[in-house]
C-alpha cells in the first residue's frame, strides 16, 4: 500500500499536532499501559540482575515512547550512572526532577554524579537542596553523609 503526498502530509500533520499537544509515541501508537508496565518490569529485572546492557535497551525504549514517566527516566539515568556516564546521568536526573516536582531523589543522584565529575561545589549544592527541601528523612540522612 503506497501513500500519496496528501495522505503523507495529513499523517505528518496529525503526528505533529499530537506531539505539540503533549502526546507521547506511546499514545500515538496506542500502546497499552499494561504493556509498558511489562516492559518496565523486564528493564527493572535486568537492572537488578546486573544485566546493564539489556536494561539500557529497555529503558531507552520506555523513555522514547513515554518521556513523561519519571520512573523510566530514573531507570535510564541509573544505567548511565552505573556505566560511569555521569554527565548523561545528571542530565536525565534533571529531567526527572523537573517532571517529578517534589521528589528530591534525582537531585541526590545528581550530587553523586557531580562528585564523580569532579564538581564538588555543584555536588554540595545538590545535597544541600535535598536537606533543605526533601520530605524524605532517609534521603536527607544520605545527603548529609556526603556533606560531613
Predicted segments — roles?
Residues 30, 49, 118-119:
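Short coil/turn and helix-start
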Residues 1-35:
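Long, contiguous interaction/recruitment modules in multidomain scaffold/adaptor proteins
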Residues 27-28, 109-115:
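A ubiquitous short alpha-helical element
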Amino acid at each position: 500500500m503506497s501513500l500519496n503526498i496528501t495522505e503523507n502530509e495529513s499523517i505528518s500533520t496529525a503526528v505533529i499536532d499530537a506531539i505539540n499537544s503533549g502526546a507521547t509515541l506511546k499514545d500515538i501508537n496506542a500502546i497499552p499501559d499494561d504493556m509498558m508496565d511489562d516492559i518496565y518490569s523486564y528493564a527493572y529485572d535486568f537492572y537488578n540482575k546486573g544485566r546493564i546492557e539489556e536494561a539500557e535497551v529497555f529503558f531507552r525504549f520506555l523513555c522514547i515512547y513515554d518521556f513523561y514517566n519519571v520512573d523510566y527516566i530514573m531507570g535510564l539515568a541509573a544505567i548511565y550512572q552505573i556505566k560511569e556516564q555521569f554527565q548523561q546521568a545528571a542530565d536525565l536526573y534533571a529531567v526527572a526532577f523537573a517532571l517529578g516536582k517534589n521528589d528530591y531523589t534525582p537531585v541526590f543522584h545528581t550530587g553523586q554524579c557531580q562528585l564523580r565529575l569532579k564538581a564538588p561545589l555543584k555536588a554540595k549544592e545538590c545535597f544541600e537542596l535535598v536537606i533543605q527541601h526533601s520530605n524524605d528523612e532517609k534521603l536527607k540522612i544520605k545527603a548529609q553523609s556526603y556533606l560531613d
